[in-house]
Amino acid sequence: MEGVAPLKKRTQRAINANRRRLLREAYERYPEYACCDPEEFNWHEAEARLNVFDLYYLADSGYLDVTRGSAGVHRTPDFYMLTPQGADLIEIPGLLAERLPLRKREREERKS
């Protein structure tokens, strides 16, 4: 796709850290929508594209509700808000570590 920044390779830790950040920002603003700054959420810069990718991943997983704008052929987010499933992920002890672990040990502790 012309004009679209490639997705750069990330570690699972980096992916989960960014997704946790987005969830926490939504949690802090609930029940209001968080605004998607076009400089932070766009298809043309590598870091901003990662934010778009992670935001839609969380939305498709049921943790965030995203209002979608239109930018030609690309889904572009305008606002996002935490869903009840997203709140559970933050509030239920151990659930965030199970779903989006930052360390291998977090997942192992949850299993035992």
Which ranges hold each PLM region?
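Clustered cysteine/histidine zinc-coordinating segments, centered on FYVE zinc fingers that bind PI3P
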Residues: 1-7, 53, 68, 104
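Short alpha-helical segments that sit at the start of domains
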Residues: 2-29
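Generic structural signal for hydrophobic core residues of well-folded globular domains
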Residues: 26, 30, 90-93
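Short acidic, hydrophobic short linear motifs in intrinsically disordered regions
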Residues: 31-46
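Short amphipathic alpha-helical interaction segments
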Residues: 44-66, 77
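Short loop/turn motifs at secondary-structure junctions and domain boundaries
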Residues: 71-72
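Short, amphipathic alpha-helical interaction segments positioned at domain boundaries
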Residues: 77-111
